[in-house]
Regions:
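Non-heme Fe(II)/2-oxoglutarate
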Residues: 1-72, 80, 89
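A short hydrophobic beta-strand segment most commonly corresponding to one strand
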Residues: 101-103, 167-181
Length: 181
């Protein structure tokens, strides 16, 4: 088989964060979660350790994105909690006003990303695909567990996946980060 050179890429960082007080964060979500204005009055000192993790890992992501070792002036623009799968996160969407987004999972959950290169798949027929990979898939679903964090380009279409089989309460805290001046 020929070696395919991957020329363009969409990076998503996935990792597990330890040493955060998840019980305290869950309680905060239950007290502050409001639809539809989830980010209003959500920020709190309780979130400081998590915000530090968002910024540290976001810095690593942006350095790789920009191809630099220099620190980038990154700041959290919005932060909010999610519980269950409401309409605002259960349909494909992106975060247009930010550079990168991050989600920290307080319970298990699924996050699905849509391939931004759909047009390139127009003649790649599903019946011809033997094994799905990053070259031929329409979507990529990440199975998250408590403590997992994902960071991604905010323009990437994504949604919180609910398949109807899970009866647990899905909880996460998300943020949008921008490049400061």
């Amino acid at each position: 088989m020929n070696k395919i050179k991957r020329m363009f890429s969409v990076g998503v960082s996935l990792f597990n964060i330890q040493n955060l007080n998840n019980d305290e964060l869950k309680t905060h979500i239950l007290k502050k979660y409001k639809i539809p204005a989830k980010h209003e009055n959500f920020d709190s000192d309780i979130l400081n350790d998590l915000k530090g993790a968002f910024l540290t890992e976001g810095q690593n992501y942006v350095k790789e994105l920009f191809g630099t070792e220099k620190d980038v002036n990154l700041k959290i623009d919005k932060i909010w909690g999610n519980t269950h799968v409401d309409q605002s996160i259960g349909i494909p969407h992106n975060h247009r006003s930010s550079l990168i987004s991050a989600v920290y999972y307080l319970t298990k959950g699924k996050l699905t990303f849509l391939n931004p290169y759909q047009l390139l798949l127009s003649h790649v027929h599903k019946e011809d695909i033997v094994s799905y990979n990053e070259l031929n898939c329409d979507i990529w679903t990440c199975d998250m567990v408590e403590g997992d964090m994902v960071i991604f380009n905010s323009a990437l279409q994504h949604y919180a996946h609910f398949d109807g089989n899970e009866k647990h309460e899905r909880m996460s805290i998300a943020c949008d980060m921008i490049k400061g001046k």
